[in-house]
């Protein structure tokens, strides 16, 4: 095989079946019980002890290796420079489509990593809090593109991550309400020098356009030390979104404060048609144009089947 043929067949990822990946857990202890696992599961997602044991414990072991290597590099560089600097937080990005289960993955990782020995401080934020308020999106004609890159206050998100990496104390992140579908005024989550920060959002692996003047333009993923992309085929994602919409119609949408309260009286047929329209107009377009193209930038890709269970894992080669 010549060099060009080898290059053509090169895969930057090592791909593991579920059973192969599960074997990489080795002796990593299970630190969560069934009750704790159930509280980490998002609406209409699937998560049980076997999923944690076979998928997330090997991830925890891998991350402990990466974090340990980063710490060794930090101390080696500190000796090399002859300076004493505060160790920077290790930042993990979690990306993927709407309805794929990013929140579940992020919460499971937070719970497992926080129980490492010694106990690190592990914080979690979602980029939803950095969406522009609805009033701003409405003025800009962007309500139908909520979740697209242009709907975020990118300078605020980049400033937040820069403050975290520089070791600033008590950095504030805006809070988003899925009930009102808007930023909560004057309420913030405070992140105070965590050892590990998990950042979850649909577009966290997004790249920016190259500037004409040649000046460097930071992107969110520049601050990540490790990234995870949760993947599933589009028809599967569409079905999950419809099922979630129907479940919310029967629960949260009945709250008069809900932005989607008007959908609560819909029949199954009407609600399904509405969910399909929203999916195709907004979420599918965002997936195809902005989210899926970022998948090759992830360190680790979890591929889910129709049953919400991870059936293969791809790890980027070093």
Swiss-Prot record:
Amino-acid biosynthesis recorded as keyword: no
UniProt xrefs under InterPro entries: P-loop_NTPase, PanK, PRK/URK
Pfam families xref list: PRK
Record-linked Gene3D superfamilies: P-loop containing nucleotide triphosphate hydrolases
One GO-annotated biological process of the protein: coenzyme A biosynthetic process
Protein localization: Cytoplasm
Record's protein name: Pantothenate kinase
